[in-house]
Swiss-Prot record:
Biased composition (Low complexity): 1-13
Residues with PTM Phosphoserine: 78
Source organism superkingdom: Eukaryota
Modified residues (N6-(pyridoxal phosphate)lysine): 405
GO terms, molecular function: glutamate decarboxylase activity; identical protein binding; pyridoxal phosphate binding
Annotated region (Disordered), positions in chain: 1-25
Protein name, entry field: Glutamate decarboxylase 1
Function as written in the Swiss-Prot or TrEMBL entry: Catalyzes the synthesis of the inhibitory neurotransmitter gamma-aminobutyric acid (GABA) with pyridoxal 5'-phosphate as cofactor.
Reactions performed catalytically: L-glutamate + H(+) = 4-aminobutanoate + CO2
Cross-referenced InterPro entries: PyrdxlP-dep_de-COase, PyrdxlP-dep_Trfase, PyrdxlP-dep_Trfase_major, Pyridoxal-P_BS
Gene from which this protein is expressed: GAD1
This protein's record includes keyword Plastid: no
C-alpha cells in the first residue's frame, strides 16, 4: 500500500455504509490492537504499524475499513473469518488413542485431521528453522546397523497392525533427526543443496494436489506451466521460441537417456519397431570426465558400454576436440556408424566446460547428433556474467538442464530440451487408448504424457515455476553469481597455503574447487608412490571425522591416477564467506594429527 490514506471510493457517501465496517469504532488503543491481532498476519502487521505512527482515531477507523474492503475485493481472508480461526487453532489432542482411520475421510474426522496436520507442520517448521541455524549439526551420524537396530525407539520395521498417530508423529521427528540437513549452509557434499522456502511451499502444494502429468485432463494448470517454462528455458538456451520440445524427467541421468533415444530415432526411426538388430553398429562419444549416466544409458538402450567411446581430456577436464575427431574416424574405419556426441557443460568433479563450439563443428562435419549435458552448468545460462562458458550451446540438438542443482530448486527437477519438435513424441508415443483419446473436447496436443518414457509422472514443475515467479530471472542470476563468487573466495584463500594443494592450476570455471589437504607429516615430502598412497588416505579419514562431528560435509574422490582429493561445490545461496572460512578451519582441525 503506497499510502496510509484510503482512496476516496472507500469513504464516499455514494458507496453507502459497509455492513462489515460500520461497527469498527473502538475507542482505545488496546481495542484497536485486538482488531489487528484478529486479522490475518499480513493485514494485522500493517494495522499495528499504523497504530504506532498515528493518534488519530478517525484515521485508524478509515484505515481498517479500507484494508478490509481491499482484502474482500481480492477474495482474501479478512478479519471477520472467525470460522477459519476456529477450525485451524491448535488444541490439546491426545494422539495416543487416535489412528489413521480417525482422519478424513472418516466421519467427524475433520478436527483430528486438522490437529494432526498442524502437528506435522510444526515439526517441519522446526526443522526448517534449525536447517538455517549454524549452531545445529549438519547431521547426527549413526552407522546403518545402529539405525536398523533401533535408536531411542525409532523402529524402521513394518508391523501388521496400525500404530497410533502419536507414534507416527514421533517417526516423523526421528526421520528428520537422523537424516542429513542438505539445506544447511555448511552442507557442501553434493551438487544439489539448499532449502528454498518458496520451492518448499510449491512441493507441499504439489503433494496436496497429488495428480499426474500425463494429460491436460487431470493436470491442466501444471501441464500449461510445464510448457511455458520449457519454452522459456529453450529461449535462454538460444533456440527460436517456435522451435523445440522438452519434458521434465526424474533426473539428469534419465534426461541424458532421452537425448540418446531421440538421436537414435532421428537417424534410425525403424529401431522403435524392429529393435537394435535392424540398425547398423552404432557408437556414442563422450568425455572421460563425463557423467557415468552416458555409459549407463548405452547399456540400458542396447548399445553396450563398449560402444560408448571415451574421449581424452586436457588437464582441466575438457574434451580435446582433436581426439574426438580421431576417434570418430577410427570408428568409421572399423565399420561402426558414429551417432552421437555428448559435450558436458560443468563436469561433476572438476566443473569443466567442454569447448562446445569446436565440438559442434565436428558434429556438423560428420552429421552427428550433439547433446550438451548441462545438468550442473545449465544454471549459468541465467547469468550474463557467466553464460559465455556455455558458448555454442545453441548449436546443440538437445540439452539436459537440472534446475535442482545450480538453481536450488528442490529435488527432483530436471529437463530434457530438444531443438526439433516432434522427435520425443515420435520416439516414445504408444497411443494408449485409455489415456490419450484423440476425440476429447479440448486440444489434445496438450496431453504431453505420451512423449515420456514413463506413464505416471510426478509434478516437478510447480515448485520451479513458483520460484521463478518469486525470484524472477534476475533473482536466479544474482543467486548463481553469488555462489561462483564464493568459489573464487575459497580458491583465493587456499591456493598459496602450504597445508593445501590445488588439483589443477588456475581459477575454477564453476563452483567446483578441488584440492588436497596436506597434513604436517607430508609437507615438504617429495612426490613418490609412498607419498601418494599416504595422501590417498587423508581425505577419507578427515571425511569420517567430519561426519562423526556433524559440523559440515564436503565430498572427496579420486580422478584418474590422482589420489583422493576434496571436491568442494557451492550451490546453496544461504552459504556465506564465514561458512567457507569455517570449512577451511574444520578441515585443518580434523587433519592436524594425521
Amino acid at each position: 500500500m503506497a499510502s496510509s490514506t484510503p482512496s476516496s471510493s472507500a469513504t464516499s457517501s455514494n458507496a453507502g455504509p459497509d455492513p462489515n465496517t460500520t461497527n469498527l469504532r473502538p475507542t482505545t488503543y488496546d481495542t484497536w490492537c485486538g482488531v489487528a491481532h484478529g486479522c490475518t498476519r499480513k493485514l494485522g502487521l500493517k494495522i499495528c504499524g499504523f497504530l504506532q505512527r498515528t493518534n488519530s482515531l478517525e484515521e485508524k477507523s478509515r484505515l481498517v475499513s479500507a484494508f478490509k474492503e481491499r482484502q474482500s475485493s481480492k477474495n482474501l481472508l479478512s478479519c471477520e473469518n472467525s470460522d477459519r480461526d476456529g477450525r485451524f487453532r491448535r488444541t490439546e489432542t491426545d494422539f495416543s488413542n487416535l489412528f489413521a482411520r480417525d482422519l478424513l475421510p472418516a466421519k467427524n474426522g475433520e478436527e483430528q485431521t486438522v490437529q494432526f496436520l498442524l502437528e506435522v507442520v510444526d515439526i517441519l517448521l522446526n526443522y526448517v528453522r534449525k536447517t538455517f541455524d549454524r549452531s545445529t549439526k549438519v547431521l547426527d551420524f549413526h552407522h546403518p546397523h545402529q539405525l536398523l537396530e533401533g535408536m531411542e525407539g525409532f523402529n524402521l520395521e513394518l508391523s501388521d497392525h496400525p500404530e497410533s498417530l502419536e507414534q507416527i508423529l514421533v517417526d516423523c521427528r526421528d526421520t528428520l533427526k537422523y537424516g542429513v540437513r542438505t539445506g544447511h549452509p555448511r552442507f557442501f557434499n553434493q551438487l544439489s543443496t539448499g532449502l528454498d522456502i518458496i520451492g518448499l511451499a510449491g512441493e507441499w502444494l504439489t503433494s496436496t494436489a497429488n495428480t499426474n502429468m500425463f494429460t491436460y485432463e487431470i493436470a491442466p494448470v501444471f501441464v500449461l506451466m510445464e510448457q511455458i517454462t520449457l519454452k522459456k528455458m529453450r529461449e535462454i538456451v538460444g533456440w527460436s521460441n517456435k522451435d523445440g520440445d522438452g519434458i521434465f524427467s526424474p533426473g539428469g541421468a534419465i534426461s541424458n537417456m532421452y537425448s540418446i533415444m531421440a538421436a537414435r530415432y532421428k537417424y534410425f526411426p525403424e529401431v522403435k519397431t524392429k529393435g537394435m538388430a535392424a540398425v547398423p553398429k552404432l557408437v556414442l562419444f563422450t568425455s572421460e570426465h563425463s557423467h557415468y549416466s552416458i555409459k549407463k544409458a548405452g547399456a540400458a538402450l542396447g548399445f553396450g558400454t563398449d560402444n560408448v567411446i571415451l574421449i581424452k581430456c586436457n588437464e582441466r577436464g575438457k574434451i580435446i576436440p582433436a581426439d574426438l575427431e580421431a576417434k570418430i574416424l577410427e570408428a568409421k574405419q572399423k565399420g561402426y556408424i558414429p551417432l552421437y556426441v555428448n559435450a558436458t557443460a560443468g563436469t561433476t568433479v572438476y566443473g569443466a566446460f567442454d569447448p562446445i563450439q569446436e565440438i559442434a563443428d565436428i558434429c556438423e562435419k560428420y552429421n552427428l547428433w550433439l547433446h550438451v549435458d548441462a545438468a550442473w552448468g545449465g544454471g549459468l545460462l541465467m547469468s550474463r556474467k557467466h553464460r559465455h562458458k556455455l558458448s555454442g550451446i545453441e548449436r546443440a540438438d538437445s540439452v539436459t538442464w537440472n534446475p535442482h542443482k545450480m538453481m536450488g530448486v528442490l529435488l527432483q527437477c530436471s529437463a530434457i530440451l530438444v531443438k526439433e519438435k516432434g522427435i520425443l513424441q515420435g520416439c516414445n508415443q504408444m497411443c494408449a487408448g485409455y489415456l490419450f483419446q484423440p476425440d476429447k473436447q479440448y486440444d489434445v496436443s496438450y496431453d504431453t504424457g505420451d512423449k515420456a518414457i514413463q506413464c505416471g509422472r510426478h509434478v516437478d514443475i510447480f515448485k520451479f515455476w513458483l520460484m521463478w515467479k518469486a525470484k524472477g530471472t534476475v533473482g536466479f542470476e544474482n543467486q548463481i553469481n553469488k555462489c561462483l563468487e564464493l568459489a573464487e573466495y575459497l580458491y583465493a584463500k587456499i591456493k598459496n597455503r602450504e597445508e593445501f594443494e590445488m588439483v589443477f592450476d588456475g581459477e575454477p570455471e564453476h563452483t567446483n574447487v578441488c584440492f588436497w589437504y596436506i597434513p604436517q607429516s607430508l609437507r615438504g615430502v617429495p612426490d613418490s608412490p609412498e607419498r601418494r598412497e599416504k595422501l590417498h588416505r587423508v581425505a577419507p579419514k578427515i571425511k569420517a571425522l567430519m561426519m562423526e562431528s556433524g559440523t559440515t560435509m564436503v565430498g572427496y574422490q579420486p580422478q584418474g591416477d590422482k589420489a583422493n582429493f576434496f571436491r568442494m561445490v557451492i550451490s546453496n545461496p544461504a552459504a556465506t564467506q564465514s561458512d567457507i572460512d569455517f570449512l577451511i578451519e574444520e578441515i585443518e582441525r580434523l587433519g592436524q594429527d594425521l
